[in-house]
Swiss-Prot record:
Belongs to the LamB/PxpA family. Forms a complex composed of PxpA, PxpB and PxpC. Its EC number is 3.5.2.9. One of its GO terms (molecular function) is 5-oxoprolinase (ATP-hydrolyzing) activity. Catalyzes the cleavage of 5-oxoproline to form L-glutamate coupled to the hydrolysis of ATP to ADP and inorganic phosphate. It comes from the Bacteria. HAMAP family: PxpA. This is 5-oxoprolinase subunit A.
Length: 244
């Protein structure tokens, strides 16, 4: 059994270089919520050195609140902003002799696109128009995945090791109780349930089905590095291969 393990990087965390030895895919902040030209270049070089698949991590323009502010923008604006960020990282990747492999929206852009078909379509179209061979990463079972499929993109359905789920398969909003899982044992058990059994237990106790093609470890999490090591060990013990 194979699984992709991804992390959001280039967001100012000291553990980036170590995480790049443990994950198979890196979502690199592309300037709108965190990161700049230099951090993108540094992350790209480190990812290439470790053989890690590189992806753009576009966001709403919200550096003050780390891309976590809800915004209502015209789809054409979201299309342009997404295309701009993909292109910025893509230029750096190309200049370093690499190939960009995927795009995963960040924060509130990701969450809103999971439920808003018009927003999801704008993102998927930007990805397709930049490079139709790119993989679009989105919340499992979400509108973003459906938009990617409509645009004939390869999609990858994502699950989260350290986030609480609602009964409909969506993430618990960050400001609500149960949004974040701080207990490593709970996060590990949830991840293995999603990967091996295709199910997740919601904060209300209801089990729901989920398709896990890639698992996210938040690079800005306090225990991200230690948890990544534990998760890799758990995968190895169960003959689950981490591969992009």
């Amino acid at each position: 059994m194979n699984i992709d393990l991804n992390a959001d990087l280039g967001e100012g965390c000291a553990s980036d270089s170590e995480l790049l030895t443990l994950v198979s895919s890196a979502n690199i902040a592309s300037g709108f919520h965190a990161g700049d030209a230099q951090t993108m270049l540094t992350c790209v070089r480190e990812a290439l050195k470790n053989g890690v698949a590189i992806g753009a991590h576009p966001s709403f323009p919200d550096r003050d609140n780390f891309g976590r502010t809800a915004m209502v923008l015209p789809p054409e604006t979201v299309y342009a902003q997404t295309l701009y960020q993909i292109g910025a990282l893509g230029a750096i990747v190309q200049a370093q002799g690499g190939v960009m492999r995927h795009v995963k929206p960040h924060g509130m852009l990701y969450n809103q696109a999971a439920k808003d078909p018009r927003l999801a379509q704008a993102i998927a179209k930007a990805v397709h128009d930049y490079d139709p061979s790119l993989i679009l990463v989105g919340l499992a079972g979400s509108e973003l995945i459906r938009a990617g499929e409509r645009c004939r993109l390869v999609t990858r359905q994502e699950v989260f090791a350290d986030r609480g789920y609602q009964a409909d398969g969506s993430l618990v909003p960050r400001m609500q109780p149960g949004a974040l899982i701080h207990d490593e044992e709970q996060a590990l058990a949830q991840t293995l349930d999603m990967v091996q059994a295709g199910r997740v237990k919601s904060v209300t106790g209801v089990w729901t089905t989920v398709t896990a093609q890639t698992v996210c470890i938040h690079g800005d999490g306090e225990y991200a590095l230690a948890f990544a090591r534990r998760l890799r060990a758990a995968f190895n013990a169960r003959n689950i291969h981490v591969i992009a």
